[in-house]
Amino acid sequence: MHLESIVLRNFRNYENLELEFSPSVNVFLGENAQGKTNLLEAVLMLALAKSHRTTNDKDFIMWEKEEAKMEGRIAKHGQSVPLELAITQKGKRAKVNHLEQKKLSQYVGNLNVVIFAPEDLSLVKGAPGIRRRFLNMEIGQMQPIYLHNLSEYQRILQQRNQYLKMLQMKRKVDPILLDILTEQFADVAINLTKRRADFIQKLEAYAAPIHHQISRGLETLKIEYKASITLNGDDPEVWKADLLQKMESIKQREIDRGVTLIGPHRDDSLFYINGQNVQDFGSQGQQRTTALSIKLAEIDLIHEETGEYPVLLLDDVLSELDDYRQSHLLGAIEGKVQTFVTTTSTSGIDHETLKQATTFYVEKGTVKKS
């Protein structure tokens, strides 16, 4: 899979831009604040209809314009497929092969991407919410039904929290409704928990040998999905019965707090090197190696799940890695993955992959191909 071309209309600082790409490595070169990251963000938006920088859709629309539009053409399974995403003040519209998609969950997954940016180093050491968003993004593009389930979960969770808040304030409400919401909540919560746990298990299978190699055989990586829901055995009915029993036991605590106290929205992922928690005890180098191992593992995992390698986006991250990790990253993707790199300079990066790259010079919202 690779992105053949992209067209941007009124997106960020690009009023009208058309670019054609190499199926191997593409480098966006320029000073800071010229629009390099905006180009990678456009590719990410075209793939996931989401950004790694903001959740406010209005940020994408050029000042005093009504909408922003991204059009791309991807080579996938031997075919050339057009994608289109428009962002307005009222929301998003998506098309695949010129056909409008009723839901974004039907659109996501046509173009798979892996992004590695400086903020991804906080995937290991940052707050649990960062890791939950990571899981949602990665599982969602491989299994679009996951996004539908996630949306349903968030809807039920919001309703249940509102109801718990009313009970906390001792308002007169129908007590049966809480039981109905809890039943619905349990079904979707178990579904998400199982999908996340399965993903983490597969991710570890790919990430552990990569980490072992980068650490020169000195470190063993383990990844644990720390779920608030216990899935004992293989019977979904047993899982549900156990969860409903647990939720009944904490029902009064939830009413007192006015919030749902267990579920995927409170889960976390933990990383261990040689048995030690990397978040708490790992050095900065170990945390960076862990993040790099995870990103490289994503590439192979997406290939296993979809039959196609994803597009890799490296947003000013090479400067955050030492020469050894740079070399390992570029060597791992060489000749395998279409890659987009943003950087202010390539002078300190001595690798054949970048020497053979197609370079685009970015300055004040204009892009020129070398």
Curated annotation (Swiss-Prot):
PROSITE patterns: RECF_1, RECF_2. GO terms for biological process: DNA replication; DNA synthesis involved in DNA repair; double-strand break repair; SOS response. ATP binds at G30, E31, N32, A33, Q34, G35, K36, T37. The keyword Cytoplasm applies. CDD domains: ABC_RecF. NCBIfam families: recf. Belongs to the RecF family. The RecF protein is involved in DNA metabolism; it is required for DNA replication and normal SOS inducibility. RecF binds preferentially to single-stranded, linear DNA. It also seems to bind ATP. This is DNA replication and repair protein RecF. It comes from Listeria monocytogenes serovar 1/2a (strain ATCC BAA-679 / EGD-e). The lineage of its organism: Bacteria, Bacillati, Bacillota, Bacilli, Bacillales.
